[in-house]
């Protein structure tokens, strides 16, 4: 019987010698699951936010800090995991991160007050983001920029099941158990990913390139070099601001849909899943576009649609046109644009990073979740009487994404 190390060596040799255009199915599923840590950890418990507020007697704006603390943890944790993945390989940091994610999820299930839950959500994010960082680095290890954009689109298809299925699952869990059972389900998800990484995922860090880093100073130097690269920063911020608008929607939609428009908690997943289908469909159509267009040209057009959708959403919220059905239209358009923006911005940002792909992936994630934290907090702080705070933040994120791309990258192709 083959040992795990033998399987790893076999896949390493296979991946190095074959001109792969897509990863093996098991590899694709594991990477998709790792990249789904954020949507799973967020979307699964969204239907439970009102129940959490009721049990702890907390204001909805306070409960939303369980989201903000998660975003902060995702931003800070990635700058730790990235250099570790470049120095020690892709798999060891994954083992540690996934293990602590399981423990933090169990802790969330037994939290006795809202403050403890907020802190444990932070721990959950710091540990779980290892999967997100390293999954992106693994793709960069094996593919060029153009092919990477196609692979990221495939991964969005896999990870896109999370925002479709998770709210449904969370809502149905609430029909039979308390919100605490949702976090036990997350612990099982983390454990399954840990086993999958151990059993099937090969080590992919390039063996012919010296490991980067030698401590905090070396890591900071790498981050400084990356931030001085205008194109890297422009692509990272274009993707980051666009996804921050998506997180503003994730933060605000439970209150808007359930509390303001009276959608039952167990039906919330239908609306959330509808928008997620748009994101998945656009990410897959992106693969077809990339057969005869550059990732940069697709990204340019997607940025314009992001601005259009955000401003239309703001107008609908200000004027109060048509209630929830009309509000859903620009939200859907915005998420469709994310499906074009996210894979192409990521692929171009990581295109020439080589052995420091882990650090570059981490910095992208930190920038993305840093602005997502601000966007999420703004939705909570701007008030809860209408959809306007959510709409204003989404529109602002779309404009900032467009501005970052135009100012730092410009109009050329990658």
Give the residues covered by each predicted segment.
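Conserved MFS/SLC helix-loop-helix module at the cytosolic interface between two early adjacent transmembrane helices
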Residues: 76-115
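Helix-loop-helix hairpin linking two adjacent transmembrane segments in secondary transporters
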Residues: 116, 153-199
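Cytoplasmic helix-loop-helix junction between adjacent transmembrane helices
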Residues: 120-161
